[in-house]
Amino acid sequence: NNIKKYSNKIYEILKIIKKSNGIVLIYSQYIDSGIIPLALALEEMGVRRYKDKNLFKKDQLKNNNIDAITMEERSGDNFNQCCYSIISGNVKLSPNKKEELSILTDKTNKDGSKIKIVLITRAASEGVDFKNIRQVHILDPWYNLNRTDQIIGRGIRNLSHCMLPYKKRNVS
């Protein structure tokens, strides 16, 4: 709840993500002042990192967990926790990049049930084909419109939404 005091942009993105019906792509060229604060905010909200250690220490996290499909808080063992992934050029921050890209684009993840949110840096802004992206958020200022178009193009690709029902073949 306090994130709004420090970053209204991250606060608004988190509000929109909670209403998401599919995979969410978020771009920032900044790691220390973009991707990491956003990842920490996601963890605080109840989203865990896919297969890697969370950036927060475990005892600092609240006991709230977000369901990957409904995006509602859940507890217990009978739900599928929402996960995020970081795709960057930094090996320490993205040690399993190839595996996570494979899961992200797999047809079993078309609804985000395995990885719901993908945070990308400039390293993934060109040459990577994502599938079934339903939302694209750009955290950075719009100083470079060509870069912005490239990032939006990661989520809107020819035939990238064909596994989804017709009414869900859109990106916001």
Where are these predicted regions, by residue range?
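Conserved helicase/translocase motor-coupling segment
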Residues: 1-40
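Structural motif
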Residues: 25-27, 117-119, 137
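Conserved helicase ATPase core of P-loop NTP-dependent helicases/translocases
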Residues: 52-122
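Conserved SF2 helicase motif VI
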Residues: 144-167
